[in-house]
């Protein structure tokens, strides 16, 4: 009887500690290029999801390089795509020039969740360590346009406009984002937590400075902005933390490791010279060889501790508690 109670107790403890291992998956299909799944392409699996879907629909993608473009339409919410790992499952395409038409992966739907997969736009991306000689143009790896969407251990690989964080509330956790120019852009209301931001400045040539973010907040009442919490910024060459794509651009780096890849000036007003007071760019509690702010642009705001805490908190994106309702846990 004593042994029986101990076993039951351990089972209960495991269930409490590891909720992510016992997620309910009411609808599930497998994508496998070898033909041993339900589909051989991710897009065909997405196509199988009913219009106006109301239940979490899991698409498990086996390891491999998938040469395809993927779109989740607006009327197909509640899709979960799970790969075998950022380095094992990779989706790659090479459209370019048109920002709107180039994304390798695009979701227009609310409640999109992705885990353990990499989306790459290969048009300008270096191959086997060699500089890519294609003319540099916008070439998007991923477009995120729906609300209440989350990305766990996802890779985004490109050079210019890699991750188009367009609109809606988004949560990125332990993701890797690679690029050189405006490679995290858009008007999303997003938290990037424990992510790796890798600057690939070698693609720009000697002495050319890149830009990590190009945030597009258009007026003072907009709730959107990019918040980076406990992130690592590293790589090669030099890059500004951000430049203003729109007149009320807002980006915060909080408790993050900024290496010397960060240009000492830090931020650029771009087309909004004379309107710098409208921009909200801040660094709080950051460390590392590129975190010294003594040479930052003089117009950069000094936010109060309470203002920083408001932005650098999950509540910034989590109205309604949608993050806790996701079928995948951190």
From Swiss-Prot:
Pfam families the UniProt entry points to: Pectinesterase
Protein name: Probable pectinesterase 55
Active site: 161 (proton donor), 182 (nucleophile)
Gene that encodes it: PME55
Signal peptide: 1-24
Role: Acts in the modification of cell walls via demethylesterification of cell wall pectin.
Family of the protein in this entry: Belongs to the pectinesterase family.
UniProt KW Glycoprotein keyword: yes
Protein keywords: Aspartyl esterase, Cell wall, Cell wall biogenesis/degradation, Glycoprotein, Hydrolase, Secreted, Signal
Species this chain originates from: Arabidopsis thaliana (Mouse-ear cress)
Chain positions of site Transition state stabilizer: 160
Positions that bind substrate: 243, 245
